[in-house]
């Protein structure tokens, strides 16, 4: 990944890219471990991470942190509120690279409007929102979309239930679209895990039926999933250029409602820009949440771009 930023600096002449290349090269050069006295296993104790959005190492660490945070938040929400859960995927059509940044901005505003509608606002208790971007290399287009985990009131599944057609209509309205977008909504029952890949495949099939293109992201994602092959090519440079620009200074995840309150109560810190060394407060075996989706961060260990 570093060589692509170096190539962008040579091509465009912006020192900004050279600085990112330097950060990537020095990322996690030194790792210090301590042995857990309880388990005897080694645990990362000290390290310097570059925190560049497209860095696969930082994305992996960020993924673990977000996954663990969400595990704690979901468990606490269940304990305090005994709420139900739904999983929502909101999509739009693919866009060319130069439209990616403004499209994401429009989606952020559309998402804000969606959760201000009375029908939605009175039915949900909050949300965890994650932005994902996949790329279709054959069409040279990008597909930004949202995955949303939503705690709902117990009576939501009765008279307050919002059907998929209504979610679709509301998202279309919020985004002011002149076409009908693909929206996937499903209930999370009991302790059943959310299989993000299965959901992605369902969405892909639905979009293919409408002759739209969605390339599905997979586990795990490496820097080679952002760029094709090991060589610096014009296509790879454009991919890094557009992704870096679209994601710069942008929050990829967001909490609202009771999930935001619980995040604050648990004093979990910032998973996107905070410490990437200390993932857990206790040196116990990491209980990876079944909600595999929450491995976020562009390129989170599941996401974002796939060749």
UniProtKB/Swiss-Prot annotation:
Domain of life, source organism: Bacteria
GO biological process, any: DNA replication
Xref: Pfam families: Rep_1
Chain sites annotated for binding DNA: 219
Single Gene Ontology MF annotation: DNA binding
Entry keyword set: DNA replication, Plasmid
Cystine connections: none
InterPro entries recorded: Rep (IPR000989)
Family: Belongs to the Gram-positive plasmids replication protein type 1 family.
This protein's name: Protein rep
């Amino acid at each position: 990944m570093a060589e692509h930023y170096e190539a962008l600096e040579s091509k465009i002449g912006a020192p900004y890219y050279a600085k990112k290349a330097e950060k990537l090269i020095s990322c996690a050069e030194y790792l210090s471990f301590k042995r857990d006295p309880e388990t005897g296993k080694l645990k990362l104790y000290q390290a310097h991470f570059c925190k560049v959005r497209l860095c696969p190492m930082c994305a992996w660490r960020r993924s673990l942190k977000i996954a663990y945070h969400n595990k704690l938040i979901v468990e606490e929400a269940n304990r305090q509120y005994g709420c139900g859960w739904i999983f929502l995927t909101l999509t739009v059509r693919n866009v060319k690279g130069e439209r990616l940044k403004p499209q994401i901005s429009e989606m952020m505003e559309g998402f804000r409007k969606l959760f201000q509608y009375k029908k939605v606002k009175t039915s949900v208790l909050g949300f965890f929102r994650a932005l994902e971007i996949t790329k279709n290399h054959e069409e040279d287009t990008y597909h930004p979309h949202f995955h949303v985990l939503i705690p709902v009131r117990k009576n939501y599944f009765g008279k307050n239930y919002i059907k998929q057609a209504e979610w679709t209509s509301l998202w279309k309205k919020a985004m002011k679209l002149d076409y009908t977008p693909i929206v996937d909504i499903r209930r999370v029952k009991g302790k059943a895990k959310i299989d993000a890949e299965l959901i992605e495949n369902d969405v892909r099939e639905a979009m293919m039926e409408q002759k739209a293109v969605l390339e599905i992201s997979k586990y795990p994602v490496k820097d080679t999933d952002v760029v094709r092959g090991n060589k610096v090519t014009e296509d790879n440079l454009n991919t890094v250029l557009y992704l870096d620009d679209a994601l710069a200074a942008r929050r990829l995840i967001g909490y609202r409602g009771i999930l935001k309150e619980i995040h604050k109560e648990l004093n979990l810190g910032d998973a996107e820009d905070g410490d990437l060394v200390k993932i857990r407060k206790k040196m116990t075996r990491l209980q990876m949440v079944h909600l595999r989706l929450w491995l976020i961060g562009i390129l989170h260990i599941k996401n974002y771009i796939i060749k």
